[in-house]
């Protein structure tokens, strides 16, 4: 099945503590989750690793967020938009449902 949200897409968060925030997709996980730049930040307590000369402390990093809590951001309308699929020149492409504009 083709993915509606892919790496380097700009997405907007629909629900949760980061609702309304926009970010770029860094990684898509096979478990139906996505890691988005600057979204769903968590604090990780890290032990020092002297062998690697790594200091310990509290590190802030992005945690995975469910794909169902995200929507693709449409730059022409400035809003979240739904994604559809269609065939153009024998290739399957994604498009925005509201404007019928092809994505990338």
Curated annotation (Swiss-Prot):
Q: Which residues form a coiled coil?
A: none
Q: Which GO terms describe its biological process?
A: translation
What PROSITE patterns does the database record attribute to this sequence? RIBOSOMAL_L24 (PS01108)
- Give a Gene Ontology cellular component term annotated to this protein: cytosolic large ribosomal subunit
Q: Does the keyword Membrane apply?
A: no
Q: Which UniProt keywords apply?
A: Ribonucleoprotein, Ribosomal protein, RNA-binding, rRNA-binding
Q: From which domain of life does this come? A: Bacteria
The UniProt transmembrane annotation reads none
Is rRNA-binding set as a keyword in this record?
yes
Q: Which GO terms describe its molecular function?
A: rRNA binding; structural constituent of ribosome
Give the matching Pfam families: KOW, ribosomal_L24
Under the subunit heading, UniProt states:
Part of the 50S ribosomal subunit.
Q: Which NCBIfam families match?
A: rplX_bact (TIGR01079)
The family this protein is said to belong to: Belongs to the universal ribosomal protein uL24 family.
Protein task: One of two assembly initiator proteins, it binds directly to the 5'-end of the 23S rRNA, where it nucleates assembly of the 50S subunit.
What name is this protein filed under? Large ribosomal subunit protein uL24
Q: Give the species this sequence originates from.
A: Yersinia pestis
């Amino acid at each position: 099945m083709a993915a509606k949200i892919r790496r380097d897409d700009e997405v907007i968060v629909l629900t949760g503590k980061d609702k309304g925030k926009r970010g770029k997709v860094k990684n898509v996980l096979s478990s139906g989750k996505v890691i988005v730049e600057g979204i769903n930040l968590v604090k990780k307590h890290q032990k020092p690793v002297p062998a690697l000369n790594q200091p310990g402390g509290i590190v802030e990093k992005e945690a995975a967020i469910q794909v169902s809590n995200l929507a693709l951001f449409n730059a022409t309308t400035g809003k979240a938009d739904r994604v559809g699929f269609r065939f153009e020149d024998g290739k399957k492409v994604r498009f925005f449902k509201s404007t019928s504009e092809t994505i990338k």
